[in-house]
């Protein structure tokens, strides 16, 4: 059969991800901080979008000039602002007397002063402002001292300790390689090669930096950091150095090996360990840490007067934007070219979709949160031990949504409950079968039970993983030993052997102190 080109029509249906749908899906999974940043960017990009302003309170209403105007005196003195115009030629003291206020404490000592220039005649010309340059509004934050970073603190000490420009240049490069915790994370040979210096020169400058405050800064390891702090206290003797060289034994609480290596008895070893515990393993964190964002819940859950749970959105985390229809009508009349009309139409469509997407996002979050609260009512009342097994499909089926939508909604979202501020993902937990064939247990509740059992153990009766399995079975929880070990390790709880050593060491310390 000969092949020949031909045309034919075919009708079919398919799902297409439009830009608007992609935008709505993206908004669902954003955290409240990411959402604010996204909306701010849209406000900058789209001229038809504007913030929905809050109604002004009565105290912010503009004053009534008739009510504010003072009663003119009978002596024929100038009224309204005439007194200022007539007194511009007088001295500053006269103006301060007329104002009946002290201008000396309006700003802090380092704030910009009033600009006083030479005027005509014998008077002075005073340019009154709000305290900021160019007549800007007074901003108290402008007078706050800038936070001193660790690098700033070290560079200030370097300028005093190293007058030689070449050594100071080496020091500045080394300080740039010290992280926020105070540790030197660079390579001395690489710095020496970059600056054309010798390894000994760079190492010598690093030793100078290690003598700066905070004590322990510039160390290349934990043992060196602790040793620097102990040297400043003149407490780094050979026995203490031997202990610092074997911190892994200290982490395993192997005190018998430490006593043998350090050549000390149990009492001296306990004193040495106590001294190490009083040191700062991250000395740099005292200076200018990174910005810490507060954890702001997206949903509030509180108990109503009738015993039911009230679920509310946190309005502070919801950006409010509007489409400026008045401005759109104005610029639409002025649009002439096809390009301008297309741009305006795209802006209007994008703005409308954004406002609808924000509204839909808020409704979806509230719907999902309400169902989570309904499913986990026992947890809110009684605590973690009553957390139910819950998966995305259960919530999705209950509210008539796809489980991928529920997954996006619960990402990076937090609920404020009587049990604390919790991530929405916390409420979704896999199930552990019941040994008696009853209701399954949530994995998070089982973790909490394991932690409670371990916290209640004594030094003479440390629970092994096998013992934990048996105790959980007595509570009706059918769980394997490897699962107990996995849950224990996920909570950073050491093994029974290590816990026994730790508890015995603590008991020895208490006996020595007594």
From Swiss-Prot:
Biological process, per Gene Ontology: DNA-templated transcription initiation
Gene: rpoN
Name of protein: RNA polymerase sigma-54 factor
Gene3D superfamilies per UniProt: Homeodomain-like (1.10.10.60), RNA polymerase sigma-54 factor, core-binding domain (1.10.10.1330)
Stated role: Sigma factors are initiation factors that promote the attachment of RNA polymerase to specific initiation sites and are then released. This sigma factor is responsible for the expression of the nitrogen fixation genes.
GO CC terms, sorted: DNA-directed RNA polymerase complex
UniProt keyword annotations, A-Z: DNA-binding, DNA-directed RNA polymerase, Nucleotidyltransferase, Sigma factor, Transcription, Transcription regulation, Transferase
Extent of motif RPON box: 480-488
GO molecular function: DNA binding; DNA-binding transcription activator activity; nucleotidyltransferase activity; sigma factor activity
